[in-house]
Amino acid sequence: MPVITLPDGSQRHYDHAVSPMDVALDIGPGLAKACIAGRVNGELVDACDLIENDAQLSIITAKDEDGLEIIRHSCAHLLGHAIKQLWPHTKMAIGPVIDNGFYYDVDLDRTLTQEDVEALEKRMHELAEKNYDVIKKKVSWHEARETFANRGESYKVSILDENIAHDDKPGLYFHEEYVDMCRGPHVPNMRFCHHFKLMKTAGAYWRGDSNNKMLQRIYGTAWADKKALNAYLQRLEEAAKRDHRKIGKQLDLYHMQEEAPGMVFWHNDGWTIFRELEVFVRSKLKEYQYQEVKGPFMMDRVLWEKTGHWDNYKDAMFTTSSENREYCIKPMNCPGHVQIFNQGLKSYRDLPLRMAEFGSCHRNEPSGSLHGLMRVRGFTQDDAHIFCTEEQIRDEVNGCIRLVYDMYSTFGFEKIVVKLSTRPEKRIGSDEMWDRAEADLAVALEENNIPFEYQLGEGAFYGPKIEFTLYDCLDRAWQCGTVQLDFSLPSRLSASYVGEDNERKVPVMIHRAILGSMERFIGILTEEFAGFFPTWLAPVQVVIMNITDSQSEYVNELTQKLSNAGIRVKADLRNEKIGFKIREHTLRRVPYMLVCGDKEVESGKVAVRTRRGKDLGSMDVNEVIEKLQQEIRSRSLKQLEE
């Protein structure tokens, strides 16, 4: 009979099989009331599942991350329950958990309107408030198939036929008259599912295949309590204000159009930000001793077959042909960098060789997934590739890590989550090679005092990797940086160097990306700063304005002087009221506004205002220039007097 060991090391002995709920009740009624599920020997199970042998048990509550995920999954079933009551002929497809919520794909003979979504949410609340028990039954494959076939649920039948073995016992979850199929676990009672909101609808192909029927996807968010739900909705409201697509239009940074889906038309001010970002990255490349190269954006398909990209990636590659040869427009830079490495004999003395490129890449992303600058088809990678010996891996990874943190800190990103992905089951290379490679990555992180978590088995078949995920001011995660070891590509493309023993050896290749793509990172920065770019990045850093025509000459002189000092400056000599001009340039997020009236002309000074409305008073022009140059040169995130 089972001995249950709890997280604090205490044990409870039973003379019969028990469920997590039984154990929770044994500990106390408060824990039983809070119990959502259990974790038995590391595996999540339903609160009602029986434990027959000795086991380690943790009780899962709404305070746990697992508990919140279970609540969200059960809210997807609640959505199914409600939609079948409102529109009984709906066919249910899949309803998984996603970040911050859930969705359900449904086949419905009407297009859902906003009013429909509101009615659906209302019915969900009505059902949840009944606090009914969710009943789980493990049944045979045949019984599950018969259940859904009798209910006309063709998508569930398809899942059973194509994805579930006939000797398996699927879990059915009964919500009163509604039944759904799932691995689980789910909440034992709907009292846990009161704090949710339906967010939007979208189209989605069954199984993600455009040859299949287009279904309607209903998105929702769910939280453990009302406070957390309201906080999330508030963050969404703030995110909408910061939407880079909206700000990009307001500030005239770029646009997209139907004739070039997923391709960016950079306007002058947006391109200024892009080029300033390039200058910054180049300064770091020089500091960390990288070469900068430029490869062709199109190469023969034969090369992509050698690399393995054609077999595994061809659907995402654009192709063209000329003179009976098929070419691929590059989706990444690495094969081109190996070609550059292969030119001329390399010695161990030439290593490490650090090769960087602002590579123009293209990927055939599905049109439905395109999203402003965040998801595009044409983008510029800031990646680099380091060719080194096995002995040099640790030092080179160390350098990559320092560079990542050096660059992210410039933009004020302080919360960075790091994950180390280790060997998958299918891989190349010996266990000894993987042992050393994984240890090198781990030691490099430890030497930099960086906490990290392992993602066991999540590495690529050709090497382990480190992923850096930064969090913005709204606590949204953006996976940007990677350091990936590659023991495969150099060998596939015949890269080699002459070792100390005069023998030819294959170099290790380190793929390194920091910003990810320039376009996406500018989108992230636009939302992080809400368009209030730090002065060094701002397209226009200073606007000088006159009050009347009599100051026009003085404004032109100052404009030239600031321009000569390397400051991006514009003169506004329009015959408009000064209050109107100030308001307009404030909305354009120009960091500094210099106002010139007769008093300023006489004294040779300027009245200085910031875009945040702060009046810095009258200042000497040379003092303004000196302070601005210092702010720009240091890439400060703060403005004068902040």
Swiss-Prot record:
It catalyses: tRNA(Thr) + L-threonine + ATP = L-threonyl-tRNA(Thr) + AMP + diphosphate + H(+). Binds 1 zinc ion per subunit. Keywords: Acetylation, Aminoacyl-tRNA synthetase, ATP-binding, Cytoplasm, Ligase, Metal-binding, Nucleotide-binding, Protein biosynthesis, RNA-binding, tRNA-binding, Zinc. Catalyzes the attachment of threonine to tRNA(Thr) in a two-step reaction: L-threonine is first activated by ATP to form Thr-AMP and then transferred to the acceptor end of tRNA(Thr). Also edits incorrectly charged L-seryl-tRNA(Thr). GO terms for biological process: threonyl-tRNA aminoacylation. It is found in: Cytoplasm. GO terms for cellular component: cytosol. Its EC number is 6.1.1.3. SMART domains: tRNA_SAD. Residues 1-61 form the TGS domain. It is an enzyme of class 6 (ligase). Belongs to the class-II aminoacyl-tRNA synthetase family. Zn(2+) binds at C334, H385, H511. GO terms for molecular function: ATP binding; metal ion binding; threonine-tRNA ligase activity; tRNA binding. It holds the Pfam family tRNA-synt_2b. Its cofactor is Zn(2+). It comes from the Bacteria. The keyword Transport does not apply. Signal peptide: none annotated. SUPFAM superfamilies: Class II aaRS ABD-related, Class II aaRS and biotin synthetases, TGS-like, ThrRS/AlaRS common domain. This is Threonine--tRNA ligase. The modification N6-acetyllysine is found at K286. Residues 243-534 are annotated as: Catalytic.
